Amino acid sequence: KLIVLIGCGSFIMCDELNRQWPDIPMILCGERDYTGPKETMIREHALPRTERIPISDLQKKYNLTLMQSSVYLNENLQLMKQLIPKMDKVMYIGDETYICQQNDYDLSEIIREKYPELDYQFLSAKDIRTDSLFNILNHVNPHTTGVIFSSWLYKSSPHDNIMRSNSHRVISTAPIPLFSLRAIGIEEEGGIVGGYIYNKEKYNARLLETIHKILDGTPARNIPLYYPDDGAPVFNYKSLLQRDLNPKLCPKGTIFYNMPPTFWEKYEYVIISITAAIITLLFFFQYLRLQSLSRIKRLQQQQLDSNLKYRNL
């Protein structure tokens, strides 16, 4: 048996799962390497530093390991400042889920400590209706404001316990560029232009490798916590242009989706075919030239032999 928990909010289930199946191996997949008091997590409040419990401490009690799907908050802010040189304000679009509340808490803290020149605003689905969000975004100056989009889950009424998503509508109709902390939505042309994210293919491969190790008998607690070290700027080239952002401002090493092919990529096969044809023709003409020279040489030799023959007479 093996349990994979997805999302930081699910980490509070470790105690109950361990009680149900003692020492069952667990893999925690989430954006943070800590959890907190169950009561705080259930209320979906952000965890201040004083309440955070490192996952490494849980390994002493539970048979688990961590696969952190890192969110690079500081790197994304640096990236936004690079693409929006006149940026003086950051907006974060999220909802009342725990991870959005935690991102809001951490973003406000980072901006206060490292970017005091920036204003910050959290737009939450808990407090703002979708139509009101569009009205706000329509009045945003994209040359001075950077917007990070996370998710847009909401309740249709205060008594509704079901969270509904309107993320697709927000992304597809947003009139401004939306930066993201995750890879979702970047490959498609639209509102999400990109962000600083980890390599999801490598992450998935490492997750499968970890699963196989545990199923082969390695205790989960003996597997080191995994932190991606391959974060990089990832952007949709066409989305950048559609949202009036200059791809040339992206840092070196940026990964682009939908980037137009270079001259070589576009005409590679044509160039190779023409080059091959020219080389073939050159070889053919060289062959004809050698044949002609050989024929002339034979005629000259015949003429020389004839002259010698007549001279001997």
Describe the residue ranges of each PLM region.
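Beta-alpha junction/loop-to-helix N-cap segments that form part of ligand/metal-binding clefts
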Residues: 1-45, 156-157, 164-165
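An alpha-beta-alpha
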Residues: 56-111, 225-236
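Hydrophobic alpha-helical segments within soluble ligand-binding/sensing domains
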Residues: 36, 47-54, 65-87, 199-216
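Membrane-proximal low-complexity regions enriched in glycine and acidic/polar residues
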Residues: 66, 116-218
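Structural motif
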Residues: 5-9, 29-32, 68-71, 93-97, ...
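Glycine-rich, charge-decorated loop segments at or immediately adjacent to ligand/cofactor-binding or catalytic sites
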Residues: 35-49, 133, 184-195, 242
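Hinge/cleft segment of the Venus flytrap/periplasmic-binding protein
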Residues: 216-272
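Alpha-helical transmembrane signal-anchor helices
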Residues: 257-303, 308-310
